[in-house]
Amino acid sequence: MDKKEIAQGLSPFVMMAFVDAQNLETGFLTRHRINKLTKEQIMGFSMETEKIINKLSHQLEQVADGNIPTDHECGTIFQYVFDKVTEALYKLLMGDEVDTQFNLKEAFDYHEPDLPEYIQLKLTNVVGKIGLINMKILHYLDENNARTNDYDSWLPAYLMVAVIIAIQFAQEIDPDDDSEMQAYLDN
């Protein structure tokens, strides 16, 4: 599969994140955007994020020494990208300075998004679903012999799925709703 075919093949995995009868295990997005971005804003943010994703891919390729990343390594990076994009977009939507940095080493160390705790809890509550989507994508890539040591052919498209899901997720976050945190504290 070439780069374009891989990207096209991965696009349906974004839909797994939406609540739907077909996505009982993976759905968490409702399409109810509290903080809407214009298409132009989304495109601009996506293009900037794509540059960052390409840099991360090249960094990983350099340190991997020709080895294909394991499921665990891929999942860690996928979740990291989801968290960091959510963080950056949340800050943008709240009118805060977007000072979010993407650092490959940080993905494998403990990192805590620079977000209020109740927003971090919203992220924590979808980790399992993000993990399932990630595993389904990796299965698809492996089934099609697309996960190779030619990182440029598959890794950016794979990570862009996390980016697209995070863009929708960040727009659905209600900054005034801390009910998940209250429920957590009550238990």
Name these PLM-found stretches:
Residues 2, 37, 41-44, 48, ...:
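Conserved aromatic-histidine-acidic binding/catalytic patches
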Residues 183-187:
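Short acidic DE-rich linear segments
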Residues 3-5, 41, 73, 119, ...:
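Single-residue recognition of alpha-helix capping/boundary positions
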Residues 1, 15-16, 43, 47, ...:
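Detector for methionine-enriched segments
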Residues 1-39:
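Leu/Val/Ala/Ile-rich N-terminal alpha-helices, chiefly Sec-type signal peptides and the beginnings
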Residues 23-26, 30, 44, 51-154, ...:
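Long, low-complexity or tandemly repetitive, helically biased scaffold regions used
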Residues 2, 11, 38, 70, ...:
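Intrinsically disordered, low-complexity coil/linker segments enriched for acidic/polar
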Residues 157-166, 175:
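Alpha-helical oligomerization segments
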